[in-house]
């Protein structure tokens, strides 16, 4: 931000009230005859004669012998300084006298204040009117070099600090508006729906608003202006995918750093799901140990939880060799012992929930005394999974936080109140997978109806009497519903070393 030059002039004007005056030297002519008189005492007599306050360094221990004839006091002081190697400096109210050996150098750096204006101010105050206090600008920097006696260095440092800090305070208290364009993150909230649920993924603006809730004033005060009471303010520009911040200028550097940290490129992760029904009877014939393993195609898969004979509980396990598992599953599918119902896949960002939903909606009539309406019922397979990429000592892993809901409509059991019935199963789990591994979930037994028809060709299609030549059968088989979930990193050029 460009500092308002008028502000510098105002500050210099305020400090001008403390302007240093030159020595007035009001008094009678001074003359002295002395022998072995301490030089400090001579200087005290000179200052008293002209009614001037003086501070003399205790390191001045020389003695004076001789005569000081009447003359201009400035010449008298300069002659003594040259004769005894002294440095003098007058700050407007006090005359300081030091040995030349106490000359010190100091570099003062400014944040905002211009070095040229600072030196101009010092000269206008007569602060640099003697060799005991000099200030030079260091070319190409925002710093000055001060050469002078200790009291000069102290005074110059104080003035530099007051002026520079006043400008910083004025600059920081100014209200500023900045725009930060995002590359990877989203400024606005992202919202999507599935079934009757609404999911909101907060954008950067919502994160900033949530973070600053405790610092936002809730009401106006007598000392605060309406323009600053609601600070900070955050808004999103969807056209540029940018965050607009309105706050004090002093806070903008912090916002810039925070938004940069939030705007990081996220790895893409592909999640694929296979919904599988395995004939329970065939699995038993192949040798199922519900407590430890399922044998598919002649090879066992270990489970970490068991199934009892009632088939009311589920299991989950990690399959290390997914390709071999799929070969055995395909063999069972060819012999009609297993069925892959669907195999959807989706790509999502790291730490962003993905939803896979296959459902059917049917309606039922609800009738009251004077009103009737239709209510919808939705059921089917719903998978919600949030992947998280982990780097464990150089090994890339994917943590899955998932929830599976598996439902289907069942035939009503009541003839007097024929409302639809829905059978639901739900699994919630977490798992960490290495590359090439898959997660197998499920194990719920459910009935599956298989309709078949046997008929005599042509005769079975005759209207009215055709049913005499055909046989319709409905068989109910017990199947086990399995979910095979695989997550893999999509290579988009991001390194995770």
Curated annotation (Swiss-Prot):
Signal peptide per UniProt: 1-20
Swiss-Prot/TrEMBL keywords: Cell outer membrane, Membrane, Protein transport, Signal, Translocation, Transport, Virulence
InterPro entries in UniProt: Bact_Secretion_Sys_Channel, NolW-like, NolW-like_sf, T2SS/T3SS_dom, T2SS_GspD_CS, T3SS_OM_pore_YscC
Single biological process term from Gene Ontology: protein secretion by the type III secretion system
Description of the deletion phenotype: Does not survive in murine macrophages, although it can invade epithelial cells. The SpiC protein is not exported into host macrophage cells.
UniProt cross-references to NCBIfam families, sorted A to Z: PRK15346.1, type_III_yscC
PANTHER family membership: PROBABLE GENERAL SECRETION PATHWAY PROTEIN D, TYPE 3 SECRETION SYSTEM SECRETIN
Function recorded in the entry: Component of the type III secretion system (T3SS), also called injectisome, which is used to inject bacterial effector proteins into eukaryotic host cells. Forms a ring-shaped multimeric structure with an apparent central pore in the outer membrane. Required for secretion of some type III-secreted effectors including the SpvB exotoxin.
Protein name (record): SPI-2 type 3 secretion system secretin
Organism name: Salmonella typhimurium (strain 14028s / SGSC 2262)
